[in-house]
Regions:
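Pepsin/retropepsin-fold aspartyl endopeptidases
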Residues: 1-177, 184-190
Length: 190
């Protein structure tokens, strides 16, 4: 997998007006290609669900028909409904950040809910992916290629809830937050 130089990293963000349990974005599908995109390439727009529980990406029969895709093989897929055989296809997937994955093997499947594409970990592992739910609004963002580790533990000081209040976790030799006068490591830090 060819990684883009950091100077070419691109990102997109999808914000919702409330909390959601399904992450959806617009994406494009076209015929696969090698090298730079051909000038006459046409992509068709679809709604995609982003699913970290899916190993690989999936397209529906409607996309297969709409794009005139030809099967490249058959594989066994494992879903919540069990194992089954599925046709495979090569497609180019155009993400909202204007990055294209020019030749990706996808399987045919049933998605439902008006969604035609499932974006799986085969795409998500190529970049940085984060979901937040600040102020009761879901937001998800993706950039490619990966630029840095996102670690909420390192970004936030450690805290505990003590008697209904959030307090910073003291270092092991600090006085304990409970007011006992003992060192934290000999009190609540055991």
């Amino acid at each position: 997998m060819k990684q883009l130089p950091i100077t070419e990293a691109r990102a997109f963000n999808v914000s919702y007006n409330g909390l959601v349990n399904v992450l959806v974005s617009d994406i494009g599908i076209s015929s696969p290609f090698q090298g730079p995109p051909p000038p006459d390439i046409t992509q068709k727009q679809y709604k995609a669900i982003w699913d970290t529980g899916a190993t690989n990406s999936v397209v529906t029969r409607a996309i297969v028909n709409d794009c005139g895709l030809q099967p490249t093989g058959v594989t066994t897929v494992k879903t919540a409904a069990g194992e089954r055989l599925a046709n495979t296809f090569l497609v180019a997937i155009w993400l909202p950040n204007h990055i294209c994955i020019p030749s990706l093997r996808v399987t045919e499947g049933i998605i439902g809910g008006g969604i035609e594409v499932l974006i799986g970990m085969d795409i998500i592992i190529r970049g940085d992916f984060a979901v937040t739910n600040t102020e009761g609004k879901t937001n998800f963002t993706f950039r490619m290629p990966s630029l840095r580790c996102i670690d909420f533990v390192k970004e936030s000081p450690p805290t505990v809830i003590f008697e209904g209040q959030t307090v910073r976790v003291p270092s092991r030799s600090d006085p304990c937050y409970c007011g006992s006068g003992k060192k934290y490591k000999r009190c609540h830090g055991k």
